[in-house]
């Protein structure tokens, strides 16, 4: 893939060549990527989040498409967040589950759940063939500030309950960033994706972190509508973070 260098103060940015858009099949995309070889990348990362960037593996990127600005960085201001009725029902429905934060170190149980989820959500697309190497490269990386938020069924006879979901979460001094969540397909009725974000918000509140970053929201994209359901949502316009009113029709 062709790469063209640019600079921002003393921080190098790279612009990728065009590639297939991961959200719209009829569009082409390109990204800005922070220099992956910069030894300061881990230290720069918290500020990069505030600039609208996101992590995937060891890469910190932001969409920078020539003819499209649909991807909008969004985050939740956790002190101002209040769950709506649907989110309160989600919390009640899942109050039997056990939630804990663990180190970002792959286990066989997590890998098995990840592969099960990919076969369910991305059949035949290549991702469903991911193994341990791809898991580590995509979710953990070499320098990230990651933790895994595990969601389990209740323990039985002092044994851990079945693993239902994992929310890969980056931790910085002032924020959490929701990287990727995967869950047991047969538990989809529990709305575990929404439940995981609610748990990340509570986690941030407990530790007095200001924001939970949710990546990108795309208006009119069905898979992104759920993000508009969260109150205290802020959007980045390229210069400033601005309030984005919750949209009750989002799912």
UniProtKB/Swiss-Prot annotation:
**What does UniProt give as GO cellular component?**
cytoplasm
Location comes to: Cytoplasm
Keywords of the record, alphabetical order, are:
Acyltransferase, Cytoplasm, Transferase
What is its EC class?
transferase
Its EC number is 2.3.2.29
**GO MF, any single term:** arginyl-tRNA--protein transferase activity
Claim: Transit peptide is one of the keywords in the record: no
A matching Pfam family: ATE_N
Reactions this protein catalyses: N-terminal L-glutamyl-[protein] + L-leucyl-tRNA(Leu) = N-terminal L-leucyl-L-glutamyl-[protein] + tRNA(Leu) + H(+); N-terminal L-aspartyl-[protein] + L-leucyl-tRNA(Leu) = N-terminal L-leucyl-L-aspartyl-[protein] + tRNA(Leu) + H(+)
A biological process term (GO) from this entry: ubiquitin-dependent protein catabolic process via the N-end rule pathway
InterPro entries assigned? Acyl_CoA_acyltransferase (IPR016181), Asp_Glu_LeuTrfase (IPR017138), N-end_Aminoacyl_Trfase (IPR030700), N-end_Aminoacyl_Trfase_C (IPR007472), N-end_Aminoacyl_Trfase_N (IPR007471)
Cysteine disulfide links: none
What is the annotated role of this protein in its UniProt record?
Answer: Functions in the N-end rule pathway of protein degradation where it conjugates Leu from its aminoacyl-tRNA to the N-termini of proteins containing an N-terminal aspartate or glutamate.
Q: Which family does it belong to?
A: Belongs to the R-transferase family. Bpt subfamily.
Q: Which NCBIfam families match?
A: PRK01305.1-1 (NF002341), PRK01305.1-3 (NF002342), PRK01305.2-3 (NF002346)
Question: What is this protein's name?
Answer: Aspartate/glutamate leucyltransferase
Q: Which species is this record about?
A: Xanthomonas oryzae pv. oryzae (strain KACC10331 / KXO85)
* Recorded name of the encoding gene: bpt
